[in-house]
């Protein structure tokens, strides 16, 4: 799980050897990404697979962006091809976004979040999803994060204030590999973007307490 190791230096005091090991693991993960990238810039879930993973593609981009911010070198063609694919898939119609599958708006919101994190927000896509008024808490958080990253904190706050943010226990091992804990960890990031540090700290403490007894997936650790 290389993603959590990108930020490990900021979270813990590590020995020189531990830092070197973490950096090595991140660099090797970056090198392996080519095995997963398809010709159109998307990423598959398994090396050599001809099919792309919707969530996995956004996750790969998220990893590359955070790694670059942390000082790791990301091959320009790798991330540029990813961006071109994300951009091509980011402007969907309201009809498609209103599909009943819970994972569809969530995956779409994550794509918009990563584009905003990359510094190239898709305003049309964000506004389309905003109009859908999804009741999915995680989708709202990701969209709020996209607006916050793009300088529209007022819109981000309005999304979070639409109703109570409920986190029912769940685990998804197919569509977006998530859980209620992963979703709450993502909310911590959004709250920090909105400078709601006390709320973020309170939620983070709850997550940490739960981590003492539960097994965490890669997604949960990374978020």
Residue map of PLM features:
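Large, well-folded core regions of big proteins
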Residues: 1-223
């Amino acid at each position: 799980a290389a993603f959590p190791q990108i930020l490990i230096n900021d979270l813990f005091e590590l020995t020189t050897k531990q830092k070197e090991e973490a950096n090595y693991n991140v660099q090797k993960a970056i090198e392996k990404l080519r095995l997963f990238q398809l010709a159109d810039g998307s990423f598959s879930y398994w090396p050599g697979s001809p099919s792309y993973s919707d969530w996995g593609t956004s996750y790969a981009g998220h990893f590359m962006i955070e790694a670059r911010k942390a000082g790791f070198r990301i091959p320009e063609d790798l991330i540029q091809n990813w961006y071109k694919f994300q951009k091509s898939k980011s402007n969907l119609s309201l009809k498609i976004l209103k599909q009943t599958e819970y994972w569809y708006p969530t995956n779409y919101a994550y794509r918009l979040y990563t584009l905003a994190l990359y510094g190239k927000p898709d305003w049309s896509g964000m506004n389309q999803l905003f109009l859908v008024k999804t009741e999915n808490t995680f989708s709202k958080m990701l969209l709020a994060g996209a607006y916050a990253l793009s300088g529209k904190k007022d819109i981000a706050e309005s999304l979070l204030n639409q109703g109570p943010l409920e986190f029912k226990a769940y685990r998804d091992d197919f569509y977006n590999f998530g859980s209620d804990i992963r979703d709450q960890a993502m909310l911590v990031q959004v709250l920090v973007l909105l400078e709601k540090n006390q709320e973020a700290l309170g939620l983070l403490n709850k997550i940490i307490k739960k981590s003492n007894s539960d097994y965490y997936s890669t997604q949960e650790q990374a978020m």
